[in-house]
Amino acid sequence: MKIFLDTANLEEIKKGVEWGIVDGVTTNPTLISKEGAEFKQRVKEICDLVKGPVSAEVVSLDYEGMVREARELAQISEYVVIKIPMTPDGIKAVKTLSAEGIKTNVTLVFSPAQAILAAKAGATYVSPFVGRMDDLSNDGMRMLGEIVEIYNNYGFETEIIAASIRHPMHVVEAALMGVDIVTMPFAVLEKLFKHPMTDLGIERFMEDWKKYLENLKK
């Protein structure tokens, strides 16, 4: 399973890359606006750091506008993946962009039916929103599992990115389902490291080592 960071913060991305566990990044206009950064410049900076897929979202909602923006964004770096909303015009744009060799990520997916359309259009990635679906019906993980099963049934090449991840159990459950990628906020990534027994074990080891050193001095 690949791990993506859902952020536009360069310091968070640097830490994840230094840990050696981050394979890519997903962004959106909201995340970039929070950083106060110029959009295209920040996308380039992220691509330079990650050397892996970086999803950058279009803001147009019409077919022509999405395709135009996508072509411009794709010029920034070979790592750029274009995030396209799950709409009729969006799916049409995905079909066009896929034919041109431009990688796409269909976002704001909330049902298996939508995920089928994304795969049929040739999307590189599809992003089901687990946490937001949980907010509505507590069925986020079930939706994700159904998408995994459908894609396996038909051998779709579109990779599934579990998005809107709220806590470590989302990550574990997605991994158990065989999801290709999980994208998460930096805070959730940090939580994956933590377990009270790990902290207790380190504390005990350090106490024993301290006693050992004290005994050597006697």
From Swiss-Prot:
<keyword id="KW-0570">Pentose shunt</keyword>
<dbReference type="GO" id="GO:0005737">
    <property type="term" value="C:cytoplasm"/>
</dbReference>
<protein>
    <recommendedName>
        <fullName>Transaldolase</fullName>
        <ecNumber>2.2.1.2</ecNumber>
    </recommendedName>
</protein>
<comment type="similarity">
    <text>Belongs to the transaldolase family. Type 3B subfamily.</text>
</comment>
<comment type="pathway">
    <text>Carbohydrate degradation; pentose phosphate pathway; D-glyceraldehyde 3-phosphate and beta-D-fructose 6-phosphate from D-ribose 5-phosphate and D-xylulose 5-phosphate (non-oxidative stage): step 2/3.</text>
</comment>
<dbReference type="Pfam" id="PF00923">
    <property type="entry name" value="TAL_FSA"/>
</dbReference>
<dbReference type="GO" id="GO:0005975">
    <property type="term" value="P:carbohydrate metabolic process"/>
</dbReference>
<dbReference type="InterPro" id="IPR004731">
    <property type="entry name" value="Transaldolase_3B/F6P_aldolase"/>
</dbReference>
<dbReference type="GO" id="GO:0016832">
    <property type="term" value="F:aldehyde-lyase activity"/>
</dbReference>
<keyword id="KW-0704">Schiff base</keyword>
<keyword id="KW-0963">Cytoplasm</keyword>
<dbReference type="InterPro" id="IPR013785">
    <property type="entry name" value="Aldolase_TIM"/>
</dbReference>
<feature type="active site" description="Schiff-base intermediate with substrate">
    <location>
        <position position="83"/>
    </location>
</feature>
<dbReference type="InterPro" id="IPR022999">
    <property type="entry name" value="Transaldolase_3B"/>
</dbReference>
<comment type="function">
    <text>Transaldolase is important for the balance of metabolites in the pentose-phosphate pathway. Does not show fructose-6-P aldolase activity.</text>
</comment>
<dbReference type="GO" id="GO:0006098">
    <property type="term" value="P:pentose-phosphate shunt"/>
</dbReference>
<keyword id="KW-0808">Transferase</keyword>
<dbReference type="InterPro" id="IPR001585">
    <property type="entry name" value="TAL/FSA"/>
</dbReference>
<dbReference type="GO" id="GO:0004801">
    <property type="term" value="F:transaldolase activity"/>
</dbReference>
<dbReference type="InterPro" id="IPR033919">
    <property type="entry name" value="TSA/FSA_arc/bac"/>
</dbReference>
<dbReference type="InterPro" id="IPR018225">
    <property type="entry name" value="Transaldolase_AS"/>
</dbReference>
